Amino acid sequence: MKKILLLGSGELGKEFVISAQRKGQHIIACDSYAGAPAMQVADECEVFDMLNGEELERIVKKHRPDIIVPEIEAIRTERLYDFEKEGIQVVPSARAVNYTMNRKAIRDLAAKELGLKTAKYYYAKSLEELKEAAEKIGFPCVVKPLMSSSGKGQSLVKSAAELEHAWEYGCNGSRGDIRELIIEEFIKFDSEITLLTVTQKNGPTLFCPPIGHVQKGGDYRESFQPAHIDPAHLKEAEDMAEKVTRALTGAGLWGVEFFLSHENGVYFSELSPRPHDTGMVTLAGTQNLNEFELHLRAVLGLPIPGIKQERIGASAVILSPIASQERPQYRGMEEVTGEEDTYLRIFGKPYTRVNRRMGVVLCYAPNGSDLDALRDKAKRIADKVEVY
């Protein structure tokens, strides 16, 4: 049995804890607020500010974990290097967690060091630099903070008149006091995919069938598997994913995102060194092993006998229309649970924010079925669940 310190206790962490419990592991779930989803199923829990390096060190010394598993980005990640030097396994590695939290570090690694195809980009530390970069790239363009998550501070800028707002919005959405943005060429893509990639301690890099997804404001709204893409494009994406994960080092599951264009091929977008929100579709039984089980096996060094597509699946999120500190209630349960070949997952978050993700609907069908119809079904059913 390993003692695992989970940093971040959202819905993805909750599913990871469930997988770990089924393999007899001991989990300490941490977050900045009490009653977070993963805490509800963990052995122990801690509530503290994970951006506070001293507090993070105190918790690590208190519990002396064998493994630290970051589940979110709001962590004082540079401290992970110290823990790794002390002999604690950091998942997938301290280098990976630090690089992927900073868009500047990961973009320069991908584009300049590894030669992966990405959108054209510049950095801006002031509104004037942002205006200069936009003039070089042209409109529309995408402006993002260097450090943020779930689309915070991200905007699509269609004209020079919108740049001042994009600058303020980006800086306000940035983590900490960093006032530097990345400005990117807007890629006219035909689709987006997540390629769940598994790096192992004692085995080859493995890939899950590609997952298509739809985002709004930089945040996931629906996903489906398998995404139908050109085999040559898939091979190109797999090669890129293997190259970047190898450079970042470590064992675990990664969510590697790509833009696909019929005319221009595959563009690397970004990656997360942990289970991916779009990968929740694997909870519909689309694979023989879901993304959380794969992550756990890679972390523990357990064998993975191969990844197989078992059936097709689609997911659609349930969002809160309200903001309240009261425990949320849900309508529509009876109607939704009466649907065939459908799972409903309510995450158990103790309070709401407007557009906070509170649950997900998962639908499945045999291989060869109509995936578009399944996507429509998942969205239709998700709309029946009301958060109040």
UniProtKB/Swiss-Prot annotation:
Q: Can you tell me which residues bind Mg(2+)? A: 257, 270
Its function, per the record, reads:
Involved in the de novo purine biosynthesis. Catalyzes the transfer of formate to 5-phospho-ribosyl-glycinamide (GAR), producing 5-phospho-ribosyl-N-formylglycinamide (FGAR). Formate is provided by PurU via hydrolysis of 10-formyl-tetrahydrofolate.
Q: Name one GO molecular function term.
A: magnesium ion binding
GO annotations of cellular component type = cytosol
Q: Which residues bind N(1)-(5-phospho-beta-D-ribosyl)glycinamide?
A: 11-12, 71, 277, 349, 356-357
Q: What HAMAP family does this protein map onto?
A: PurT
User: What's one Pfam family here?
Assistant: ATP-grasp
What is the protein's species of origin? Bacteroides fragilis (strain ATCC 25285 / DSM 2151 / CCUG 4856 / JCM 11019 / LMG 10263 / NCTC 9343 / Onslow / VPI 2553 / EN-2)
Output the NCBIfam families linked to this UniProt entry: PRK09288.1, purT
- Give the family from UniProt: Belongs to the PurK/PurT family.
Q: Return the protein name.
A: Formate-dependent phosphoribosylglycinamide formyltransferase
